[in-house]
Curated annotation (Swiss-Prot):
Name of protein: tRNA pseudouridine synthase B
Function: Responsible for synthesis of pseudouridine from uracil-55 in the psi GC loop of transfer RNAs.
Entry EC number(s): 5.4.99.25
Organism: Pelotomaculum thermopropionicum (strain DSM 13744 / JCM 10971 / SI)
GO BP annotations listed: mRNA pseudouridine synthesis; tRNA pseudouridine synthesis
Gene3D superfamilies reported for this sequence: Pseudouridine synthase (3.30.2350.10), PUA domain (2.30.130.10)
Catalytic activity: uridine(55) in tRNA = pseudouridine(55) in tRNA
Domain PUA per the UniProt entry, residue ranges: 238-312
UniProt cross-references to InterPro entries, sorted A to Z: PsdUridine_synth_cat_dom_sf (IPR020103), PsdUridine_synth_N (IPR002501), PUA-like_sf (IPR015947), PUA_sf (IPR036974), tRNA_psdUridine_synth_TruB (IPR014780), TruB_C (IPR032819)
Length: 316
């Protein structure tokens, strides 16, 4: 089986465990997700099956959306509710307008220090592996982009640990727990991420996601294929270049596609632009537009991720 599954990851499972479960349900060897969710978090986990795993690197860069609950007045060792409390302060002074007032400071380009619980490597070891050993190392700030951060509602006003529910839209690589920690520091009371749900990853929305139980039930009924999303839909944001039947074999071999082999394409494609090459059997490849150095008028598309071989077999 080849394609994409939009899984609703439950809290309490690691992303790795979810992928293992998917492998067993679908009976495939190759499967991988396109962006980790913490074990305590829930929501959209995009899993690629079979040849679709080649598309994972193109989906990793997609923007994401979350619902996040922030608890003020308590900082933890991990930045979420699973760590030990490292600092506790009375945040009963906080009001809704205090939080709304600082939100513009956390939108646009924001500098973040990756948490020790992240998978970033430091001298060959992942940070979370070092954290398990009780080590803390210096990390460099990274720039991320927060498209929007909206206050939805709050609770516990006037208590030592009020909470706020937010909607977050952000770029890849954004550490939500770091955002919560930094907001708590800005407000002078500390904070941690107490709940997180990913509501969207690129084109995949939580409203369209399926649970592991639903997938297992579909497998029992023999209708598991209905839960698979076609590869072409996963990369539909890329401009489409339709390939003539006579040029499909060359694309499958990874050769450059020139205009004579194109049936239809958008106008004004710039060099370096990624496109999707499609043929009679669906998605053939992801390719990069370019021009020959000796003939700037000669446009071509160089495959950077070929899927055509599998597409050809599946059509028989």
């Amino acid at each position: 089986m080849n394609g994409i599954v939009n899984v609703l990851k439950p809290p309490g499972m690691s992303s790795h465990d979810v992928v293992d479960r998917i492998r067993r349900i679908f009976g495939v060897k190759k499967a991988g997700h396109t962006g980790t969710l913490d074990p305590g978090a829930a929501g959209v986990l995009v899993v690629c099956l079979g040849v679709a795993t080649r598309l994972a690197r193109f989906l990793l860069g997609e923007d994401k959306e979350y619902r996040v609950e922030i608890t003020f007045g308590m900082s933890t060792s991990t930045g979420d509710s699973y760590g030990e409390i490292t600092d506790q302060r009375d945040a009963s002074f906080l009001k809704e307008h205090d939080i709304i007032r600082v939100l513009p400071e956390f939108t646009g380009e924001v500098r973040q220090v990756p948490p020790m619980t992240s998978a970033i490597k430091w001298r060959g070891k992942k940070l979370y592996e070092l954290a398990r050993e009780g080590l803390v190392v210096e990390r460099q700030e990274r720039a991320v982009y927060i498209k929007s951060l909206e206050f939805i509602r709050g609770s516990g006003w006037g208590t030592p640990s009020p909470r706020a529910l937010m909607h977050l839209s952000c770029s890849k690589g954004t550490y939500v727990r770091s955002l919560c920690h930094d907001m708590g520091s800005r407000l002078g009371c500390g904070a941690h991420m107490s709940f997180l749900v990913r509501t969207r990853a690129g084109p995949f929305k939580i409203a369209d996601s399926v649970t592991l139980e639903e997938l297992q039930a579909a497998a029992s009924k023999g209708v598991l294929e209905r839960k698979i999303i076609e590869m072409d839909r996963a990369v539909s944001e890329y401009p489409e270049v339709i390939v003539k039947s006579s040029a499909v074999k060359a694309v499958a071999a990874g050769s450059k596609l020139y205009i004579p082999g194109v049936a239809r394409m958008p106008l004004d494609l710039d060099c370096g632009k990624l496109v999707r090459l499609t043929g009679p059997d669906g998605l053939l490849a992801i390719a990069e537009a370019g021009r020959e150095p000796f003939d700037k008028e000669k446009l071509f598309f160089k495959p950077v991720c070929v899927l055509a071989r599998q597409a050809g077999r599946s059509s028989n």
